[in-house]
Amino acid sequence: MGIARTKTIKNKHSAKLANLRNNKSSSSQADGGNFVRAKKSGTGSNKPPLTSQAKGRPSIADLLKKKKKRVYTEKELGVPKLNMITPVGVEKPKGKKKGKVFVDDPESINTILAIVQAEKEGQIESKIMKARQMEEIREARRVEAEKKEAERQAKLEDTKNSLRKKRSRSNKTEDDGVSELAATGSKATKAKKKKVAFA
């Protein structure tokens, strides 16, 4: 046995591989190469090499392939539909035909419907009542405004008439005074006193 040649190692991991190769070559030299391995003849059956996997287990290649994931619909997942308002009584139970049975007991749905109808009718009635009240108030205000306007017009006419009467009276007195002065002339005489004698 001689001294083995050393090689420069560029990679630290390749040192282990080199040691293994050296060991194999030294062991084959130690055996002296006394035996020769028999080569397999090509005339044998062409069977594929057996894999280490059993028949029932999937192979690594099958595992590495990506499986298509199943996509579930919203109906299968039971996701509620958005942007829809459905009353509690009208909601369709799962697994039952649509339009057949909405609620377990029909009395409860009838009471719910009656309550809703009463509320709606009450709202409508209250709106009608409010409209009537507002109409009555408007009518009363209109009548009151007409009455006030009539009173104001009457007062205005009274004041106009009184002013006309005053004017006519003042004109008459002035005319009487002027006529008396014209009749008596320029002489200013005392007015004669009326004497009344009793028998």
From Swiss-Prot:
GO terms for cellular component: nucleolus; preribosome, large subunit precursor. One of its GO terms (molecular function) is mRNA binding. One of its GO terms (biological process) is intracellular mRNA localization. Keywords: Coiled coil, mRNA transport, Nucleus, Ribosome biogenesis, Transport. It is found in: Nucleus, Nucleolus. Residues 1-59, 141-199 are annotated as: Disordered. It comes from the Eukaryota. The keyword Coiled coil applies. InterPro entries: Loc1 (IPR037650). Residues 129-175 form a coiled coil. Residues 20-31, 42-54 have a biased composition (Polar residues). Residues 189-199 have a biased composition (Basic residues). Residues 141-161 have a biased composition (Basic and acidic residues). Required for efficient assembly and nuclear export of the 60S ribosomal subunit. Belongs to the LOC1 family. Component of the 66S pre-ribosomal particle. This is 60S ribosomal subunit assembly/export protein LOC1. It comes from Pyricularia oryzae (strain 70-15 / ATCC MYA-4617 / FGSC 8958). The gene is LOC1.
